[in-house]
Amino acid sequence: MYLPEKSVLLELISRCSSLRVFKQIQTQLITRDLLRDDLIINKVVTFLGKSADFASYSSVILHSIRSVLSSFSYNTLLSSYAVCDKPRVTIFAYKTFVSNGFSPDMFTFPPVFKACGKFSGIREGKQIHGIVTKMGFYDDIYVQNSLVHFYGVCGESRNACKVFGEMPVRDVVSWTGIITGFTRTGLYKEALDTFSKMDVEPNLATYVCVLVSSGRVGCLSLGKGIHGLILKRASLISLETGNALIDMYVKCEQLSDAMRVFGELEKKDKVSWNSMISGLVHCERSKEAIDLFSLMQTSSGIKPDGHILTSVLSACASLGAVDHGRWVHEYILTAGIKWDTHIGTAIVDMYAKCGYIETALEIFNGIRSKNVFTWNALLGGLAIHGHGLESLRYFEEMVKLGFKPNLVTFLAALNACCHTGLVDEGRRYFHKMKSREYNLFPKLEHYGCMIDLLCRAGLLDEALELVKAMPVKPDVRICGAILSACKNRGTLMELPKEILDSFLDIEFEDSGVYVLLSNIFAANRRWDDVARIRRLMKVKGISKVPGSSYIEKFMTLDQ
């Protein structure tokens, strides 16, 4: 019988990717008693680590040759499984190996904690933390670093800080681990505060996390400082840092800087394109977002994923570009993009905002797993397109099904009341959101809706009282609603001084508002304010022109 040489078997194992084929090779290894050879064992372990599906079989093989194995083989397998797409297999393999007689060492636990972090295995990780302490490995820096990372990514900031605080020595991995944990769980200020205390040289991963946190809290100066540092150090220039810089500038609404970094990237991936497209949408530059998406399709060779497509759908919704939105919808269906609640919600939002209510309802009813954002998309679309009563009906249905309305939900309800003239219902929803049941604090948009509703109903005095009670200054919508109501009632000269003063800080694009305010101040002999308004008009290049004023336009909105 032909027996292949050891070198041939090594080559066959290296090329092998099938468990069925490997079992045939294994027969030769057993026949020639090569499963005790170090080179063969290393190749076998490498093969078994190629797929999480091999985990059960790997425990059988390793158990059969356990007498000649070192911990290195077990740890190598655990490290391989920890980075696969089935991280729970790592825990299974660890427990199986231990039950078969394997004695863990300090290098065993980092991949196990890494796997626990990937699937948020808090219970499993804490159990193994206890084992680490009992076995005397807790003081090892590699183990402690892996614990900090595990607790951090699982949102257990208190435990992460506890381990970090107990470390006798901290290296760059320790500091980056705690900063990463803060960043991933939304504790951005804590991440930046920790970075400011860092007493070792940061690495690329540190800077990426700090850039993300800087963007989330609007700390542009720190972000720019890191950008300058990256440009001076070639080792820090990478696609990952480039993407983080784009994200930081976008979140700080510095789109020109974001576009410059985007343009300078030698290579762009989906994250690059998505960060830039979603950033343009966030900054209300939807037309540019769609143009950039078109450029991506024609020049990059990158196929859009669900994240990019939801951003494009949002841009279509903002522009009312239903034809482009419909194309994206069809692309999702034909390209095999995984349909989830996020994508379904974006499609409902696009059709609803574009006024295609029947299509929006059809998509909405077809979404099996809805969340509050899905309901908000439908309610908002119904409200702004003249279906106020139906919007309120869906609001009540949403509550009955156990969904908890948020600020956007209540804004949709108030919009529905405003567009339908339901004053009593509007009051009820406005007070309901502030009740103990929901404990939500109205934002400027909610006050604007409520004041608009009251003004349209001729309840100017109640609207003025609400303006006085607002914790924030009024905006253009509120000013327009109040002035419209005053004009209709012929009481322009009776506006309270504090309200008129608050209107002075608002910048308008329409000459009618400035002229009307100027006349009011003139009637009240507030000549300095008259001069101030006229200077503002001159600076902004606004002159009184014939035709409809902002007030008149405002009064005809949604009629």
Swiss-Prot record:
One of its GO terms (molecular function) is RNA binding. GO terms for biological process: RNA modification. The keyword Disulfide bond does not apply. PPR repeats lie at residues 70-104, 105-139, 140-170, 171-201, 203-233, 238-268, 269-304, 305-339, 340-370, 371-405, 406-440, 443-473. InterPro entries: E_motif (IPR046848), Pentatricopeptide_rpt (IPR002885), PPR_At4g14850-like_plant (IPR046960), TPR-like_helical_dom_sf (IPR011990). Residues 478-554 are annotated as: Type E motif. Belongs to the PPR family. PCMP-E subfamily. This is Pentatricopeptide repeat-containing protein At4g38010. It comes from Arabidopsis thaliana.
